[in-house]
C-alpha cells in the first residue's frame, strides 16, 4: 500500500517502512505525527484520488532526526567589473519513518 502526501509545499509518494526527508516540521525526535493531507492512496491496481484530499485518510509517521542538508554554494560575478559575491544556504529537514497508512 502506498500514499501520496503533501507536506511543506511538496508531494511525496510513501509506503510503510520508508524513511524520507521533508521540509522541517517542529517536532521532537521519536514523536509520532499524523500527516492528514493525503492526495492519493493506492494498493495494487486500485487507486483512490482525492478532490483535492482523500477524505478520512491519514499517514502516521515517527520523527527519526532533525538536520540540515549539505551547503549549496552561490557565486555571483560581473565580468570585467571586479564584482564577485559568495554566499551559501543550508536547508533544514526532518527525517520521517512511515509507520501506517490509514485509508
Swiss-Prot record:
InterPro entries linked to this entry: bL21-like (IPR028909), bL21-like_sf (IPR036164), Ribosomal_bL21 (IPR001787), Ribosomal_bL21_CS (IPR018258)
Domain of life from the UniProt record: Bacteria
GO molecular function, one term: rRNA binding
The keyword Transferase appears for this protein: no
Keyword Ribonucleoprotein part of the UniProt annotation: yes
Record-level GO BP terms: translation
Keyword annotations from UniProtKB, A to Z: Ribonucleoprotein, Ribosomal protein, RNA-binding, rRNA-binding
PROSITE patterns in UniProt: RIBOSOMAL_L21
Cellular component terms (Gene Ontology): cytoplasm; ribonucleoprotein complex; ribosome
Subunit architecture: Part of the 50S ribosomal subunit. Contacts protein L20.
Job description of the protein: This protein binds to 23S rRNA in the presence of protein L20.
Family: Belongs to the bacterial ribosomal protein bL21 family.
Name recorded for this polypeptide: Large ribosomal subunit protein bL21
Organism expressing this protein natively: Paraburkholderia xenovorans (strain LB400)
Gene name linked to the record: rplU
